[in-house]
Amino acid sequence: MPRKHLIASGINKKQQQQAKIWMKCAKEIKAAAKMGGPNPEANPRLKVAIERALNNNLSRDSIERNINGASKDADNLKELTYEGYGPNGLAIIVRALTDNEQRTISAVRGYFSKLQGQIAKPNSVSMLFNEYGQLLIDKKTKTLDEWFELLVDQDIVDINEDDEIIEILVQPKDFSATKLILENNNANIQSAEIKLIPTDFISLDDHARERLVRFVNACENDDDISWVITNYEEEL
């Protein structure tokens, strides 16, 4: 009996997590469609938002409803960016989509306080990041040099590899074209998104890392927060 209860509890928690992801995907689609129009081919942000939603199993019907309802439903949504610092000078950017700015800033301040960090002035932290299109593909189909030759006409910022993955960074304007070239050449794309990439990385001791993990988890569990990014050297 207790075991069944634990299984049911685990299933319910997983369903709640999935519902939260879908809600965030829907909010991003609405905001992207309102800001850049309903055509994903002419709106790179919307195209990325749709792909992320599909990767998280949000139905196409739900995606269409959110695009079509963007002009009405997104009126109350406001996009906010909070910049700040954590332990050891850790640079942090938090992006939110919210219909209640006071609620969101109050929550974000609380998260920074528990991290023993502080919110900084606008643009004081963003200078430590560059916005690039990042594409991660596995190495099974072609070598790094072969991919580089295929992408030579794109504005590639960097291309590197580890034992399993090739990472390609491009300017945002070339993101869609680069992704299409990869798809047309049978690349196994593990991840594709336009994101902020730190210009440099820092390390943390174990105690500070634990606080950072709690901070990131709190942000990810907040319905108003779309994403959080830092210049910590490890992936959490």
Swiss-Prot record:
A molecular-function term among this protein's GO annotations: DNA binding
Protein localization: Cytoplasm
Keyword Cytoplasm: yes
GO annotation terms (biological process): regulation of DNA-templated transcription
Chief localisation class: cytoplasm
Keywords noted in UniProt: Cytoplasm, DNA-binding, Transcription, Transcription regulation
GO cellular component terms given for this protein: cytosol
Family of this protein: Belongs to the TACO1 family.
This protein's name: Probable transcriptional regulatory protein UUR10_0292
Species, as recorded: Ureaplasma urealyticum serovar 10 (strain ATCC 33699 / Western)
Classification of source organism: Bacteria, Bacillati, Mycoplasmatota, Mycoplasmoidales, Mycoplasmoidaceae
